[in-house]
Amino acid sequence: RMTIFTTLLAMPDQFERLLAQVPADQLDWEPANWAGTPAEHFSARGHLCHLLDIETQGYQLRFRRTLEESLPLLASLDGYQLARDNQYPLQDTAVQLDRFRTARLQSVAWLKALPSSAWARRARYGDYGEVTLDGLVRLLVSHDHQHLAGMQWLLMRLNADLELALPLERAKA
């Protein structure tokens, strides 16, 4: 499981590198055409806020309930409703990134402390049906990858639609 923990812990830095490529005045930009996006329809700031909310209100709760309850029924969250409720465009990206980093560290520390028997605990999760705790962790990694892909797609659209010619890597100051 060390590899999956390493993957989970790398996410905040991976996301931060992509976010750094978005000009500050374009953090809330959304394209007119979302065709082909691999993620939900979020701005760069929206992706970040969504990752934090899904970590804290989604997966952390799902993990705990799977451990503590007998075959709990886990709800899927409406990402767009969370965006409205939590006013994503008003959030400070530095604060949100710090909160996401902290939440992810907490998630991994909690998971690392579990006995090996915990990984087979089961829950019923939305359209996925029955899943194990191990499966929930894999779904979180999948969700991370979806949003990294969504950010790459958004950077592609920023370049194409606004003719920004953003570099593939931000030069180090």
Label for each model-derived stretch:
Residues 19-24, 69-73, 110-119:
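Proline-centered turn/helix-capping motifs that create local helix->coil transitions or kinks
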Residues 1-8, 38-56, 80-97:
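Charged, low-complexity, helix/coiled-coil-prone segments
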Residues 7-11, 80-120, 136-140:
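Acidic/histidine-rich alpha-helical segments that form the ligand environment
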Residues 29-79, 108, 122-173:
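Short, contiguous alpha-helical
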Residues 1-28, 54-61, 65:
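Alpha-helical bundle segments that constitute or directly flank the non-heme di-iron/ferroxidase center
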Residues 14-21, 103-110, 146, 150:
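Solvent-exposed, charged/polar functional surfaces in cytosolic regulatory/catalytic domains
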Residues 22, 42, 88-91, 114, ...:
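Short coil/turn linker and secondary-structure boundary residues
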